[in-house]
Amino acid sequence: MLARAERPRPGPRPPPVSLFPPPSSLLLLLLAMLSAPVCGRVPRSVPRTSLPISEADSYLTRFAAPHTYNYSALLVDPASHTLYVGARDSIFALTLPFSGEKPRRIDWMVPETHRQNCRKKGKKEDECHNFIQILAIANASHLLTCGTFAFDPKCGVIDVSSFQQVERLESGRGKCPFEPAQRSAAVMAGGVLYTATVKNFLGTEPIISRAVGRAEDWIRTETLSSWLNAPAFVAAMVLSPAEWGDEDGDDEIFFFFTETSRVLDSYERIKVPRVARVCAGDLGGRKTLQQRWTTFLKADLLCPGPEHGRASGVLQDMTELRPQPGAGTPLFYGIFSSQWEGAAISAVCAFRPQDIRAVLNGPFRELKHDCNRGLPVMDNEVPQPRPGECITNNMKFQQFGSSLSLPDRVLTFIRDHPLMDRPVFPADGRPLLVTTDTAYLRVVAHRVTSLSGKEYDVLYLGTEDGHLHRAVRIGAQLSVLEDLALFPETQPVESMKLYHDWLLVGSHTEVTQVNTSNCGRLQSCSECILAQDPVCAWSFRLDACVAHAGEHRGMVQDIESADVSSLCPKEPGEHPVVFEVPVATVGHVVLPCSPSSAWASCVWHQPSGVTSLTPRRDGLEVVVTPGAMGAYACECQEGGAARVVAAYSLVWGSQRGPANRAHTVVGAGLVGFFLGVLAASLTLLLIGRRQQRRRQRELLARDKVGLDLGAPPSGTTSYSQDPPSPSPEDERLPLALGKRGSGFGGFPPPFLLDSCPSPAHIRLTGAPLATCDETSI
C-alpha cells in the first residue's frame, strides 16, 4: 500500500516542531545522543551530483531534422567554426556554437534500384539506406565523405563553399563498412586517407589500408588471421615526428581495436584489446609483402580490472589528448569493458605513446602450433635491420632507402611475427576509474588550466543509457563530478567531439550541444568550491561562480581538497522543516536523508538509548517501539562544512500537538478527496447493480423460451470464471492484491496504520518523507 503526502513548500507556515529541547537541557541531550553513519564512503566513480533531464535541458542546445536519424558521424572544422554531421541519407553543416539557426544540408539518397538490390540480398528496409560513416577534411576547399549506400559503399567529395552535392563518386569498398553496425576507423594524414574496416559484403575480410589511387595499388594488411582476427575497430590516430621530438622519424598511424585471440587459454573465445601501428612512408615489399605493410606491428593493451584483468576484454573507445605545441607528447584515454555476460564493468585507462613505442621495440611473440601459448622470440633469431621499423635516416645510410629495398628475410619475419610479446601497461599501472554500475561507450578529453596555473585533464564519458559523466583527473584517479541526462528518451551516446568550451554529442535522434563552462548553475561559494571544476572559481567581487579565464584577483578555487571551511565565508545555516512522524503500530520506519552530494559524509543524531537502528544508503531504518520516540536529525558534511539535511520527530499518533497544523490541513484535503472518490464509487455501484438486475431479467426471459443460458447475449463479452491474474501494478505493489475489496479501490482508508499482511514498504500518512518496512512484522 502506498500513500504519499506532498512535502510542504517553503513560505509562511506555523513554527516548526522544535527538534531540540530547551537550552537548559541541550548539553545533556547532546552528550546522550548517539551518532550513526548513513553509509560507507562513496567511491569517486559515483557521480557527485546528478541532473535529471528536467534540470539539464536548460543547459543544452539540440539539433534534429524531421524524419532524419543516426547522427553518428561528427567532424569539427576549427578554421571555419563549422560542425559537419553525417546522418542517414543526409549531411549537415552547422555554425558553431549553434543556437537554432537553419543549417546547410545535402541529401545523399540511395536510388531505388540500389535499394531493391539491397532487399534482394536479404537486408531489411531500414538497413537499405546510406548511413554516413566517414567525414574528413581533404583540403582547404573539400571534404571527403563515405557512406554505406545500401550495402554498396560509396565515397565522394563535397565543395564546402557551395555545399550542394557529393561529387566524384567512387567505390568505397575497403574504406567504408557495408553497414553501420560494423565498427570502423579512419584518419587523414598528409592528405591521405588511412582506414580500418571490412572489405567484403559478409564482413569476414578485415583490412587496414592506405587508400590512395586504384584499389590494387593500395598498401594494406595481409589476409592472415595472425594479422587481424575478427577485429572490431575503434579509433585511428596520427602522431608526427615533431610530437615525439624525433626529427629523424616518420608519421606513425595508430589503430585501436578488439580482436579474438589465437592463443587458446580456455574453451571460450577470448577477446583482446590491441593497438597496431604502421608508418606513413611504407611502400610495401618488392617480392615478399607486395602492396602489403612492412611496418605493421601490434601489441596488447592492458587495463586490469578487479577480476584479474577481465575488465579489459573489450575496447569501447579511445581518444587522444594533445597538449599545446612543445608541452609534451599526447596521451591516449580508453574505455574498456568486460566480454563476460553478467560482468557489467567499465574501466578507464590512460596510455603514453612512448610506452607503446617501447613495447613495439621489444621482443616479438611466436605462436607455437604444438602448444597453446605464445612464446617470445629470442634476440638472436631476429634479423637485421629490425623488422617493422620505419625507414629512418640511419637506415638510409645502410642502403635501405625505402621498404622496397628490405631483404626477404626481414619481410618474411615481419609477415610471420606481427604481434609483440609484452603488453602495453597503463600510464599509472592501473585504471584511473573502475565502475560496476555504468556502461561507458564514448570518451573525449581536454586539458584545463586551473586558477593556480596547474593543468588538469577533464574527461567526458558518454553512457549506454544517454547520460554524460564529467570527470577530472587528480593524480592517478578520476573523480566523476557530474551526471547529466542528455536525452528525453533513453538511447546510447554514439559520438562526441569537443569545440572550445562546447561538447557536441551525436545520437540516434539528435545532436546535442553542451556548455562545458556553465559555472552560473553553482549558486553559492560552497557549491562552487565543492564542484571541483577547474574551469569555475568563486568571485567575491561578483558574488558568483564564474569561468575564471586565468584571472586571479578576488577569486578562490580548490580542485584537490575542496576546503570550503577555509575559502568561503560562513554561510547562514538553513534549518530544515522538522517533519512529525506519528506512528501507532509496531513496524519499521525509514527516515530518508538525501544530501545534494553523493560524496557527502552523513551521520544520524537520535535520542539516547535507541539501539534498533539500521543505517541505509537512503536513510535510517528505525524499529518502532515506545522507546524510539523522539528527535532524529541527519547531518551531512563535505569540504569541512556541515549542515542538517533532514529532521524528524517520531511520536505516537495520540501525541500529535497543535504544532502540526500543516499536516492537519493536508489531511483534511486528502479526506475531502477520498470522500469525493467514495461518492463517485457509490454512484458507479448503483449503476452497476441496476445493470445486473436488467441482465437477470433478460436471462429469465430467455430461459422461458428455451434459450441457452450459458451463451453470452449479443453485444457482450464472455469472461472466464478463473480469478483475475495480477496486473503489472499488482506485482509492483503486492499489498494491492492482499487488500483488494477493503477501503477505496482495494486500499485501506486514509490515515490508518493497520498491520500489513504481506511484506512491503509503505508510505506513512502524515509523514511525507517516511516509509514503513513491514517485512519483519
Curated annotation (Swiss-Prot):
Transmembrane domains' residue ranges: 668-688
PSI domain location: 518-569
Tissue: Expressed throughout the adult brain, where it shows particularly strong expression in the hippocampus, corpus callosum, granular layer and deep nuclei of the cerebellum, and the mitral layer of the olfactory bulb (at protein level). At the cellular level, detected in neuronal precursors, postmitotic neurons, pyramidal neurons, and glial cells including mature oligodendocytes and oligodendroglial precursor cells (at protein level).
Residues exposed to the Cytoplasmic side: 689-777
Disulfide bond annotation, renumbered to this chain: C118-C128, C146-C155, C279-C390, C303-C349, C519-C536, C528-C545, C593-C634
Membrane topology: Single-pass type I membrane protein
Nucleus keyword on record: no
Effect the entry attributes to changing T490P: In strain: BALB/c
Domain Ig-like C2-type: 586-641
Sequence ranges on the Extracellular membrane side: 41-667
Subcellular localization, as worded in the UniProt entry: Cell membrane; Postsynaptic density; Perikaryon; Cell projection, Dendrite
Pfam families listed in its UniProt record: PSI, Sema, Sema4F_C
Residues carrying a glycan: N70, N139, N515
Annotated spans, Disordered: 703-742
Top-level taxon of the source organism: Eukaryota
SMART domains referenced in this protein's UniProt entry, alphabetically: PSI, Sema
Cellular-component GO terms for this entry: dendrite; endoplasmic reticulum; glutamatergic synapse; membrane; perikaryon; plasma membrane; postsynaptic density membrane; postsynaptic membrane
Signal peptide stretch: 1-40
Motif (PDZ-binding): 775-777
Start and end residues of each Sema domain: 48-516
Family the UniProt entry places it in: Belongs to the semaphorin family.
Matching PANTHER family: SEMAPHORIN (PTHR11036), SEMAPHORIN-4F (PTHR11036:SF72)
Oligomer status and interactors: Interacts (via PDZ-binding motif) with DLG4/SAP90 (via PDZ domain 2); this interaction may promote translocation of DLG4/SAP90 to the membrane.
Function statement: Probable cell surface receptor that regulates oligodendroglial precursor cell migration. Might also regulate differentiation of oligodendroglial precursor cells. Has growth cone collapse activity against retinal ganglion-cell axons.
Name listed for the protein in its UniProt record: Semaphorin-4F
Organism per entry: Mus musculus
Gene behind this protein: Sema4f
